[in-house]
From Swiss-Prot:
One cellular-component annotation, GO: cytosolic small ribosomal subunit
BP-aspect Gene Ontology terms: translation
Keyword Protein transport: no
Organism domain of life: Bacteria
Cysteines paired by S-S bonds: none
Lineage summary: Bacteria, Bacillati, Mycoplasmatota, Mycoplasmoidales, Metamycoplasmataceae
Membership in a protein family: Belongs to the universal ribosomal protein uS3 family.
Biological role: Binds the lower part of the 30S subunit head. Binds mRNA in the 70S ribosome, positioning it for translation.
Record protein name field: Small ribosomal subunit protein uS3
Self-association state and partner proteins as the record states: Part of the 30S ribosomal subunit. Forms a tight complex with proteins S10 and S14.
Alphabetic keyword roster: Ribonucleoprotein, Ribosomal protein, RNA-binding, rRNA-binding
GO molecular function terms listed in the Swiss-Prot or TrEMBL record: mRNA binding; rRNA binding; structural constituent of ribosome
Gene3D superfamilies: 3.30.300.20, Ribosomal protein S3, C-terminal domain (3.30.1140.32)
Length: 227
């Protein structure tokens, strides 16, 4: 039986950049890795409040951390005169339990939140928690993404759908979705809906078209690094 590979990890270093960019010696690697996990979990909890689509962590040679937060609500994330951002950084320091660490948080505006797989998954999960139909929630997200320029969208919701005793999966797909073509610019994300009858899992794949030339791939990676 074939196993499905994560589309993001499948494309890291080819058409997508890694979510953590740093180098460390053996004795510091595990410490840095655990800090990265804490940072990702910290911003995961703020995803719905600030519409956070992705988090990228970078470290320099002095181990100073720069966190790039891609958000669709840039104004509310920064706050008046950057006050809210300062509070978020302070809470992040407390989470890491390391007051000496140098950490900066930079916010990047998401131009097309309708095409962001993470935000789509969270939108579907939010509607499921509001007891809306899982069919309507998925179809609405797919139609919205296709209207805004996606070439293909696939969604799956798994769990006790409509509260039935036996868990099952139901999904929809429209447009092209070449998951094993590395040139295909595919975003993948998951989300969890906590309902009264249990947890539902949401998976979303968004195809943004095929990258024809190597120069296009290099341009995407350079643009991501500049951001």
């Amino acid at each position: 039986m074939g196993q499905k590979v994560n589309p993001n990890g499948f494309r890291f270093g080819i058409t997508r950049n890694h979510n953590a960019i740093w180098y460390a010696d053996k004795n510091k690697f595990s410490i840095n890795l655990l800090e990265d996990v804490k940072i990702h979990r910290f911003f995961e909890k703020l995803t719905r409040e600030y519409q956070i689509g992705n988090t990228v962590i970078r470290r320099d040679r002095n181990n100073a951390i720069t966190v790039l937060v891609y958000t669709a609500k840039l104004g509310s994330f920064l706050g008046a005169s950057g006050e809210n951002l300062k509070k978020i950084v302070e809470k992040l320091r407390k989470t890491l339990k390391n007051r000496k660490i140098v950490i900066n948080v930079d916010a990047v505006d998401i131009q097309s939140p309708e095409l962001n797989a993470k935000l789509m998954a969270e939108l579907i999960a939010e509607k499921l928690e509001q007891r809306k139909s899982y069919r309507i929630a998925q179809k609405f997200a797919i139609r919205t993404a296709l209207k805004n320029g996606a070439t293909g969208v696939k969604t799956i919701v798994c769990g006790r759908l409509n509260g039935v005793e036996m868990a099952r999966c139901e999904g929809y797909a429209e447009g092209e979705m070449k998951l094993h073509t590395l040139r295909q610019n595919v975003e993948y994300a998951t989300a969890i809906a906590k309902t009264t009858y249990g947890i539902l899992g949401v998976k979303v794949w968004v195809s943004l078209g095929e990258i024809k030339e190597k120069t296009d791939i290099d341009a995407i990676i350079r643009a991501d690094k500049r951001r």
